[in-house]
Amino acid sequence: MQNTTHDNVILELTVRNHPGVMTHVCGLFARRAFNVEGILCLPIQDSDKSHIWLLVNDDQRLEQMISQIDKLEDVVKVQRNQSDPTMFNKIAVFFQ
């Protein structure tokens, strides 16, 4: 994973948890040539949903990407997460 900068932001998605959802989300980014720097996905306890956190570049296309993500059938909610984007570096250290 690359070093994060102030130009990165975390998007938090709540999605329906079933096979293929991650493919739809990542496919949207791929089709728009919008790089995802980091991904974390965890199921929501006692639910059929999951949270996906995406570390992405905060550029002029981001608002349009958020709008497109929100239109995906299995996305229940998408928002900017106010956490420090460097949390992805801390997670990476854990797995090294």
Curated annotation (Swiss-Prot):
Every ACT domain range: 10-83
Recorded catalytic activity of this chain's protein: 2 pyruvate + H(+) = (2S)-2-acetolactate + CO2
Gene Ontology cellular-component terms listed: acetolactate synthase complex; cytosol
Coiled coil location: none
Enzyme kind, highest EC tier: transferase
One annotated GO molecular function: acetolactate synthase regulator activity
Key word Secreted present: no
Pathway terms, separated by semicolons: Amino-acid biosynthesis; L-isoleucine biosynthesis; L-isoleucine from 2-oxobutanoate: step 1/4; Amino-acid biosynthesis; L-valine biosynthesis; L-valine from pyruvate: step 1/4
The keyword Nucleotide-binding is annotated on this UniProt entry: no
Keyword annotations of the record: Amino-acid biosynthesis, Branched-chain amino acid biosynthesis, Transferase
Origin: domain of life: Bacteria
InterPro entries, A to Z: Acetalactate_synth_ssu, ACT-like_dom_sf, ACT_dom, AHAS_ACT, AHAS_small-like_ACT
GO biological process: branched-chain amino acid biosynthetic process; isoleucine biosynthetic process; L-valine biosynthetic process
EC code: 2.2.1.6
Family: Belongs to the acetolactate synthase small subunit family.
Subunit structure: Dimer of large and small chains.
Misc. remarks from the entry: E.coli contains genes for 3 AHAS isozymes: ilvBN, ilvGM and ilvIH.
Name assigned to this protein: Acetolactate synthase isozyme 1 small subunit
